[in-house]
A protein has these predicted regions:
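A short helix-loop-beta-strand connector motif used in the catalytic cores of GNAT acetyltransferases and
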Residues: 58-69
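Acyl-donor (CoA/ACP) binding surface of acyl/acetyltransferases
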Residues: 1-41, 71-189
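Hydrophobic alpha-helical elements and their junctions with loops/disorder across both membrane
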Residues: 47-50, 61, 128, 135
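Conserved GNAT-fold acetyl-CoA-binding loop/helix
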Residues: 38-59
Length: 189
């Protein structure tokens, strides 16, 4: 079952990052990574060809209050996003009784391979189970997105099944893999 999220006053600080609400002043940093071919496509959306597209998405992020900007502490640059979305578990007979949210993330190609996405994801998972009335967090990756698969494995999610995802913005059906982490998985450790 879906739950409401409001991150408008939430700041999560990790060793190298700050997860924080988006601001209009983030537009240039956002466009810098969202306009690079291959970045958005790994998450199901086409890279931004025009800054006005980024501006529209930025406004949706600000108004939606469910997606964080990922800011590097060292240089105060926004290099990605991570946030909550409606979970695939809401439509699954086995899991729909759970209060669940899906997490999704995107990071600048310039920062791939530095362990920043797992750092952000682990912090968001910890915050979620500490501050939200949530039973489960779900996540999925496109089958050929091995970087995302590694992030999911590093975070300790449990594989559920392979499936397909209708990436409407890309006008494609894509094979994906779905994972879940239950609150009980955390409390058992």
């Amino acid at each position: 079952m879906d739950i409401a999220v409001d991150i408008s006053n939430v700041y999560i600080v990790t060793q190298r990052l700050i997860l924080r609400p988006w601001q209009k002043s983030d537009l240039n940093d956002f466009y810098a990574y969202a306009s690079v071919p291959g970045v958005g496509e790994m998450a199901g959306w086409p890279h931004h060809k025009f800054k006005r597209t980024t501006k529209q998405v930025l406004q949706l992020f600000i108004e939606g209050k469910s997606v964080f900007a990922i800011e590097v502490q060292e240089n105060n640059k926004v290099i990605g996003s991570i946030g909550f979305h409606s979970s695939w578990a809401n439509d699954d007979p086995e899991y729909r009784h759970l209060k669940a949210k899906d997490i999704g993330y995107t990071i600048s190609k310039d920062y791939w391979g530095q362990g920043l996405t797992p750092e952000a994801a682990k912090a968001l998972i910890d915050w979620s189970f500490s501050h939200m009335d949530i039973d489960a967090i779900t996540v999925a990756h496109f089958r050929d997105n091995y970087q995302s698969k590694r992030v999911i494995e590093k975070c300790g999610f449990t594989f559920v099944r392979e499936s397909t995802y209708n990436a409407r913005q890309l006008n494609r059906i894509i094979d994906d893999a779905k994972y879940i982490m239950l609150r009980s998985d955390i409390s058992d450790k």
